[in-house]
């Protein structure tokens, strides 16, 4: 039988007590708890969140990368890349979001949590593929969505919208070939319709 969820404030206190000085920031907003930890404490904090009696987050439901470079003022002041995980305690009926920033923007690295939760395996590969975030200790960190010869990481904010290369099937060579992108860069601006009685408004 699943336990009745505790109040969000009680969960915040339980998580803060379990993590102690590993907590850099803890925010309770809209009844959702977000905990930020440093990259140095990330692996130990995640282990505590799984094993501490008041937490018992047995399941990692999601893990993704974030590029904060164009996110308001954050990109100009703080670290560029972060990893966000969503954890679930089935036995205690509670959830928490964990955020960790990569300390080096040029080579973003955080510890892998795939040894704690098997479900992190493909999530970390996806974050590596799309953002270039390296997960130290991952057994098989290789691309999962893009082609093996893909150049760059397509979810980074500085990745060109048209990409670097395109692939097509060459009927003469009877194989897939890679070529430089032939799409011309252009500004895409929505057309604004300005009519006096547009949409029935008078």
From Swiss-Prot:
GO CC annotations on file: plasma membrane
Group of enzyme by EC: translocase
Gene Ontology terms for molecular function: NADH dehydrogenase (ubiquinone) activity; NADH:ubiquinone reductase (non-electrogenic) activity; quinone binding
Coiled coil: none
Membrane-protein topology: Peripheral membrane protein
Keyword terms, alphabetized: Cell inner membrane, Cell membrane, Membrane, NAD, Quinone, Translocase, Transport, Ubiquinone
Subcellular location: Cell inner membrane
EC annotation from Swiss-Prot or TrEMBL: 7.1.1.-
Main location: membrane
Catalytic activity: a quinone + NADH + 5 H(+)(in) = a quinol + NAD(+) + 4 H(+)(out)
Function: NDH-1 shuttles electrons from NADH, via FMN and iron-sulfur (Fe-S) centers, to quinones in the respiratory chain. The immediate electron acceptor for the enzyme in this species is believed to be ubiquinone. Couples the redox reaction to proton translocation (for every two electrons transferred, four hydrogen ions are translocated across the cytoplasmic membrane), and thus conserves the redox energy in a proton gradient.
Quaternary structure annotation from Swiss-Prot or TrEMBL: NDH-1 is composed of 14 different subunits. Subunits NuoB, C, D, E, F, and G constitute the peripheral sector of the complex.
Assigned protein family: Belongs to the complex I 30 kDa subunit family.
Protein name, as recorded: NADH-quinone oxidoreductase subunit C
Lineage: Bacteria, Pseudomonadati, Pseudomonadota, Betaproteobacteria, Burkholderiales
């Amino acid at each position: 039988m699943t336990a009745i969820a505790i109040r969000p404030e009680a969960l915040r206190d339980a998580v803060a007590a379990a993590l102690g000085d590993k907590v850099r920031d803890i925010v309770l907003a809209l009844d959702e708890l977000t905990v930020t930890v440093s990259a140095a404490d990330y692996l130990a904090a995640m282990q505590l969140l799984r094993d501490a009696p008041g937490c018992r987050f047995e399941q990692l439901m999601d893990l993704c990368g974030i590029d904060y470079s164009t996110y308001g003022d954050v990109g100009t002041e703080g670290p560029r890349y972060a990893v966000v995980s969503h954890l679930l305690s089935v036995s205690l009926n509670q959830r928490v979001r964990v955020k960790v920033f990569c300390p080096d923007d040029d080579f973003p690295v955080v510890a892998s949590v795939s040894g704690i939760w098997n479900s992190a395996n493909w999530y970390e590969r996806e974050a590596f593929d799309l953002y270039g975030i390296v997960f130290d200790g991952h057994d098989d960190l290789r691309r999962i969505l893009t082609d093996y010869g893909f150049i760059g990481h397509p979810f980074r904010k500085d990745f060109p919208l048209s990409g670097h290369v395109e692939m097509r099937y060459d009927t003469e060579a009877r194989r897939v070939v890679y070529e430089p992108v032939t799409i011309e860069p252009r500004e895409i601006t929505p057309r604004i319709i300005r009519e006096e009685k547009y949409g029935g408004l008078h």
